[in-house]
């Protein structure tokens, strides 16, 4: 519950705003582990992200049977425009059905149905694109604090 709001006439100097919530001032705020000499800036926005919530790594899914995959997504600092799902390790993507839009900062439920055509190991992926066109990247965003990590999540399953 919100108890009070404090309005400041200058930037806050508490630990969280002056030291903790900071990322490298470089494209995508990503650096290599061990890199030094970059300027840090405050985190002022968030990045789109999507999760698969009803299928776990190692699950066995039936071949040639309809499979429902559910999840959630958020657009970061704006709304969710779309979520796409891949059943072939990101080689192809299909649109996902989105649940109600409860506002630009809310989580959106999502679901999609698919049929696995053959047996074997499969990688399921979900990729969110927000309303300003920013999509989750396929590469990891790494920085010393771990903020703004939004790489496309992978769920490894076995088709049987």
What residues fall within each predicted segment?
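Extended, aromatic/histidine-rich regions of cofactor-dependent oxidoreductases associated
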Residues: 1-160
């Amino acid at each position: 519950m919100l108890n009070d709001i404090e309005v400041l006439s200058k930037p806050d100097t508490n630990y969280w705003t002056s030291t903790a919530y900071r990322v490298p001032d470089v494209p995508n705020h990503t650096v290599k582990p061990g890199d030094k000499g970059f300027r840090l800036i405050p985190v002022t926005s968030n990045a789109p992200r999507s999760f698969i919530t009803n299928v776990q790594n190692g699950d066995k899914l039936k071949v040639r049977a309809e499979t429902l995959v559910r999840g959630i997504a958020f657009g970061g600092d704006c709304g969710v425009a779309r979520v796409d799902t891949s059943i072939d390790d990101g080689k192809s993507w299909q649109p996902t059905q989105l649940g109600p839009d409860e506002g630009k900062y809310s989580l959106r439920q999502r679901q999609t149905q698919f049929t696995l055509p053959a047996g074997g190991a499969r990688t399921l992926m979900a990729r969110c694109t927000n309303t300003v066109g920013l999509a989750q990247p396929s590469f990891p965003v790494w920085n010393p604090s771990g903020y703004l990590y939004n790489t496309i999540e992978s769920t490894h399953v076995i088709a049987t």
